[in-house]
Regions:
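A conserved hydrophobic position in a structured secondary element of the catalytic/binding core
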Residues: 50-51, 102, 178, 225
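Short phosphate-binding loop-to-helix
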Residues: 47, 53-112
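Short, high-confidence coil segments that cap the C-terminus of an alpha-helix
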Residues: 43, 89, 118-120, 210
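Conserved alpha/beta core of the MobA/IspD/sugar-nucleotide pyrophosphorylase nucleotidyltransferase superfamily
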Residues: 165-243
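Conserved core of the sugar-phosphate nucleotidyltransferase
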Residues: 102-192
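N-terminal glycine-rich phosphate-binding loop and ensuing alpha1 helix
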Residues: 2-49
Length: 281
């Protein structure tokens, strides 16, 4: 089975322009995400899908693979679906480009959650036991889950409301795994009323009758959406004393290590009217 991890990366972020290339622990942030993704056991291939040649070039120089997608993609799922047209696979994993502290174990878990049954078409992860402060933060998305593991609802509000005084909040982590046909059909869905109210794309799928299966994450992750978030991530890297993770087969600046083979130049495909492949050198 071919399982491809795709990291959507947009340069023109409203809250943080140029976010994927922002320096973090001595390297562009997108390379930390790429390294974490490549540490996952169950991904057979990892690539960055971006509408910006600068991001593609940084990824290429590190030994990674980048796909140039259209600037019109409205969401990460749309960018993923666009990439899937050109890169066949059985399963696609949407890896958030703003998650430099993403755990490889969580990536494997979302794939395992999807593959637990051939009837499952979409899977994601949640973290149990978050406190009320996080639950009341509208930037932290919560999910209510049925006994069989299906998502009942996602919200920026604190759900479910602890009327009995015993909180049971679960934080949604923005990792998704999709079967190929499901991804194609999801991308064709129009925006839905609940999606517009909460500004949560996954509500579009629930409203259309899709089941989203939720696995239990092994650890939390910090999303970087603003320069302030980046500063927090930098503090975590410094406190852990981590050396920047390298893309497999490369050295600190994307160069090959002495004992590893030199990676071939990454192919950057422009997804548009032509089917030609470009190799950026």
């Amino acid at each position: 089975m071919k399982v491809i991890g795709v990291i959507p990366a947009r340069y023109a972020s409203v809250r943080f322009p140029g976010k994927p290339l922002a320096p973090l622990s001595g390297r562009p942030m997108i390379l930390h995400v790429l390294a974490a993704a490549r540490a996952a056991r169950l991904l057979t291939r990892v690539m960055v899908a971006t509408d910006d040649a600068r991001i593609a070039e940084v990824v290429r120089e590190s030994g990674g693979e980048a796909l140039l997608t259209s600037a019109e993609a409205a969401s990460g799922t749309d960018r993923l679906a666009e990439a899937a047209v050109r890169v066949p696979a059985d399963v696609y994993v949407n890896l958030q480009g703003g998650e430099p502290l993403m755990a490889a174990e969580n990536v494997d878990l979302v794939v395992e959650t999807l593959l637990a049954s051939p009837a499952r078409e979409i899977a994601t992860l949640a973290l149990s036991g978050i406190g009320e402060t996080a639950a009341r933060d509208p930037n932290v998305v919560k999910v209510a889950v049925a006994a069989d593991g299906r998502a009942l609802y996602f919200s920026r509000a604190a759900i479910p409301f602890p009327r009995s005084g015993v909180p049971a909040f679960r934080k949604h982590l923005g990792l998704y795994a999709y079967r190929a046909d499901a991804l194609r059909r999801l991308a064709a869905l129009p925006p839905s009323p609940l999606e517009k109210i909460e500004s949560l794309e996954q509500l579009r799928w629930l409203e259309a009758g899709w089941s989203i299966w939720v696995g239990e994450a092994v650890s939390d992750s910090i999303g970087v959406d603003t320069p302030e978030d980046l500063a927090k991530a930098e503090e975590i890297f410094e406190s852990r004393g981590d050396r920047p993770k390298q893309v497999a087969g490369t050295g600190p600046e994307g160069a090959c290590t002495r004992n590893s083979p030199r990676p071939a130049p990454a192919t950057v495909q422009r997804l548009g009217k032509t089917a030609e492949k470009e190799v950026i050198r």
